[in-house]
């Protein structure tokens, strides 16, 4: 094999049969394997929907919006890419059909096409190829994930563009990986390959012959069945891999490595690389599977609890907090709208309470009840973005005695707008891409819990909001005991709050976007630690039943 040069090689990941097979995790895991072989890896996600970005889409439809340092609102798969590799995502790492068409139409309006009829081929496909090359950024390998399912009409321009790329860059500089489903039919008692055969047939009709197949299955696919898939799909038998269901997503790179996927990619790319070093991944998986400090229950009080993908980065950041404390974090999703009905029993069953970000008035009173419960019962509390604002409103009403206190987002007539619209947001009418987005500095106050957790005076965190704490009320809150432990040094905006005497922390930013399994975010590590301490303290206390036992003669 030749030693790798500076020319970028491209791996295109497509999916077939059904959606939600795990293309993003597969792409991220491949990135982790290649990076651990000493290669520089970058990622690109191509989404076929017409929205310019996912920023205005419902979490129920799209899942989480992942925010990058440069303020891009992107697909949640970019979170997987950042968590699994050292690559830093920016707005150039996620393109949608809407954004591609927007670029082309703007060029047409500027007259850059010199009077030509602008068409899908070549103009749209050329634009797609241009953003693919731009995303590479000089990396050894660019992994391009094409969203959607092969056969969807929306994906066709992207598939045509990646078909052309192999001819543009050369055979050994472009590899096609196709993720399919090999289901086990319980009634027949066997795995079925027909869905995979049909999916590959559809891909080949478009003009793309996959170089390797990742076959998602809940069990190992035997060698003879892999040979059958290879025969009918015109793929080398050594290029058919089981993408096995595993208990933890952090086991996926190890599972694919055991299948020999990274060796095959090195062969297909004809690229030199060292032997993979996966000890860190093995350690992480061991900590996830065999925590020495047992299990801790974290209650997430939100309104998107039916779809856990809505809080993807948050969920993983809590897992990372568990890794940092050698504990397993069990998430209990608590519907805030149900709390409004008066049943708070779910809050009794958790060791800590977290109120995440969100938008809109629905469920906010339930979140405020969750905050009140945590404050009054000394249960560790962590409020993120809207969660901080809920904590402020709860304290204003129940400690400061400011009746009717609220956020201007929910009540424009509130007598006490303790949460107000940011100055820079006044007059903004467009919804897409207009919030306070991206990384901003936060100066931490000496002697606070926030300063102790971070171990730094100044940090940078990612934001996604329009509303902020109203500094007109700051003196009243400080007099009541609230500590403003983090402030934006440029604008004086409140970034962090806390209450002394308990683990009660709120932040206006989204720390979950910066957490990784190998580098758990300090706020999540500290939160899980506090939850463990609360759990242990509760277990040491005698139960109510024991307290009621009659005292004996020797008592």
Curated annotation (Swiss-Prot):
Region: Amidoligase domain, residue numbers: 1-271
Keywords associated with the record: ATP-binding, Glutamine amidotransferase, Ligase, Magnesium, Metal-binding, Nucleotide-binding, Pyrimidine biosynthesis
Annotated catalysed reactions: UTP + L-glutamine + ATP + H2O = CTP + L-glutamate + ADP + phosphate + 2 H(+); L-glutamine + H2O = L-glutamate + NH4(+); UTP + NH4(+) + ATP = CTP + ADP + phosphate + 2 H(+)
Catalytic residue list: 385, 510, 512
Record-listed E.C. numbers: 6.3.4.2
Region (Disordered): 536-555
Binding-site positions, L-glutamine: 358, 386-389, 409, 466
InterPro entries in the cross-refs: Class_I_gatase-like, CTP_synthase, CTP_synthase_N, GATASE, GATase1_CTP_Synthase, P-loop_NTPase
Residues bound to CTP: 19, 152-154, 192-197, 228
UniProt cross-references to PROSITE patterns, sorted A to Z: GATASE_TYPE_1
KW Electron transport (keyword) present: no
Sequence positions that bind ATP: 20-25, 77
Gene Ontology annotations of biological process type: 'de novo' CTP biosynthetic process; pyrimidine nucleobase biosynthetic process
A single MF term (Gene Ontology): glutaminase activity
Annotated control of activity: Allosterically activated by GTP, when glutamine is the substrate; GTP has no effect on the reaction when ammonia is the substrate. The allosteric effector GTP functions by stabilizing the protein conformation that binds the tetrahedral intermediate(s) formed during glutamine hydrolysis. Inhibited by the product CTP, via allosteric rather than competitive inhibition.
Binding-site list for Mg(2+): 77, 145
Leading EC class: ligase
Family: Belongs to the CTP synthase family.
Assembly information from the UniProt record: Homotetramer.
Miscellaneous comment in the UniProt entry for this protein: CTPSs have evolved a hybrid strategy for distinguishing between UTP and CTP. The overlapping regions of the product feedback inhibitory and substrate sites recognize a common feature in both compounds, the triphosphate moiety. To differentiate isosteric substrate and product pyrimidine rings, an additional pocket far from the expected kinase/ligase catalytic site, specifically recognizes the cytosine and ribose portions of the product inhibitor.
Name of this protein: CTP synthase
Organism: Anaeromyxobacter dehalogenans (strain 2CP-C)
Lineage, opening ranks: Bacteria, Pseudomonadati, Myxococcota, Myxococcia, Myxococcales
Protein's gene: pyrG
């Amino acid at each position: 094999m030749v030693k790798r040069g500076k020319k970028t090689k491209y791996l295109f990941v497509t999916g077939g049969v059904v959606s939600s097979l795990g293309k993003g995790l597969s792409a991220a895991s491949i990135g982790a394997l290649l990076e651990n072989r000493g290669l520089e890896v970058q990622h690109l996600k191509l989404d076929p929907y017409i929205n310019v970005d996912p920023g205005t889409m419902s979490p129920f439809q799209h899942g989480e919006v992942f925010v990058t340092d440069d303020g891009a609102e992107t697909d949640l798969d970019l979170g997987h890419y950042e968590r699994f590799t050292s690559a830093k995502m920016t707005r150039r790492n996620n393109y949608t059909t809407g954004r591609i068409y927007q670029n082309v139409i703007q060029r047409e309006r500027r007259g850059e096409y010199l009077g030509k009829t602008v068409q899908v081929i070549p103009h749209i496909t050329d634009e797609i190829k241009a953003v693919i090359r731009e995303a590479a950024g000089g990396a050894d390998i660019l992994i391009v994930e094409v969203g959607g399912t092969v056969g969807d009409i929306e994906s066709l321009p992207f598939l045509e563009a990646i078909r052309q790329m192999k001819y543009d860059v050369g055979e050994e500089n472009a590899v096609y990986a196709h993720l399919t489903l090999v289901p086990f039919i319980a009634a027949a008692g066997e795995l079925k390959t027909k869905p995979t055969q049909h999916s590959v047939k559809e891909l080949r009709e478009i003009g793309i012959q996959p170089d390797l197949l990742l076959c998602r299955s809940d069990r190992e696919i035997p060698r003879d069945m892999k040979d059958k898939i290879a025969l009918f799909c015109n793929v080398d038998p050594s290029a058919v891999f089981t993408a096995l269901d595993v208990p933890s997503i952090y086991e996926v790179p190890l599972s694919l490595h055991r299948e020999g996927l990274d060796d095959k990619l090195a062969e297909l790319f004809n690229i030199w690389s060292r032997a993979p070093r996966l000890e860190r991944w093995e350690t992480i998986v061991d900590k996830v599977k065999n925590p020495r400090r047992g299990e801790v229950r974290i209650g997430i009080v939100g309104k998107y609890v039916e779809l856990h993908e809505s809080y993807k980065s948050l969920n993983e950041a809590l897992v990372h907090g568990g890794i940092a404390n050698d504990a397993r974090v069990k998430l209990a999703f608590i519907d805030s709208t149900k709390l409004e009905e008066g049943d708070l029993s779910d809050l009794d069953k958790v060791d800590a309470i977290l109120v995440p970000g969100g938008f809109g008035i629905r469920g906010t009173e339930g979140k405020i009840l969750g905050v009140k419960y945590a404050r009054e019962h000394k249960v560790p509390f962590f409020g993120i973005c809207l969660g901080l604002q809920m904590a402020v409103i709860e304290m204003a009403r129940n400690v400061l005695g400011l009746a009717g206190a609220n956020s201007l987002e929910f009540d424009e007539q509130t007598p006490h707008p303790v949460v107000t619209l940011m100055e820079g947001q006044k007059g903004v009418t467009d919804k897409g891409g207009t919030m306070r987005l991206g990384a901003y500095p936060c100066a931490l106050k000496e002697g606070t819990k926030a300063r102790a957790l971070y171990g730094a005076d100044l940090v940078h965190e990612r934001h996604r909001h329009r509303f902020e704490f109203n500094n007109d009320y700051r003196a009243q809150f400080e007099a009541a005991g609230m500590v403003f432990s983090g402030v934006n040094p440029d604008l004086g905006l409140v970034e962090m709050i806390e209450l002394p005497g308990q683990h009660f922390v709120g932040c206006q930013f989204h720390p979950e976007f910066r957490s990784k399994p190998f580098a758990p975010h300090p706020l999540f590590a500290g939160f899980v630690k506090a939850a463990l301490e609360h759990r242990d303290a509760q277990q040491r206390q005698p139960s109510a039943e024991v307290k009621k036992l009659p005292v004996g003669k020797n008592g």
